[in-house]
Design a protein with these regions (language model features):
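Short, structured beta-strand/loop micro-motifs enriched in basic residues and often containing a Trp
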Residues: 1-8
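Basic/aromatic-rich interaction segments and small domains that mediate binding to polyanionic partners
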Residues: 7, 14, 21-61
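Intrinsically disordered, low-complexity linker and terminal regions at domain boundaries
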Residues: 66-71
């Protein structure tokens, strides 16, 4: 998907968008991908910076927009 989480924002009524900080299952990260019904998140503690799918309302807390996006090392 390439609509920057528009479906997720509308359907689930959450502020999901690429670049927003989140806490997923107690771990902090950043949304980096629109995955249709899911959001693609890179967790801060993942050294390989892999994008993982998360449901937008299950164990998810939304924060502010990130100032920088993580890069793969």
């Amino acid at each position: 998907m390439s609509h920057n989480c528009a479906y997720v924002r509308q359907h689930y009524q959450v502020p999901a968008e690429v670049g927003r900080r989140v806490i997923a299952y107690g771990k902090s990260g950043i949304i980096l991908a629109d995955r249709g019904h899911y959001i693609g998140v890179v967790l801060d503690d993942d050294p390989k910076k892999r994008i993982s799918n998360y449901h937008p309302t299950h164990e998810m807390q939304y924060g502010e927009m990130a100032e920088t996006l993580p890069l793969k090392e």
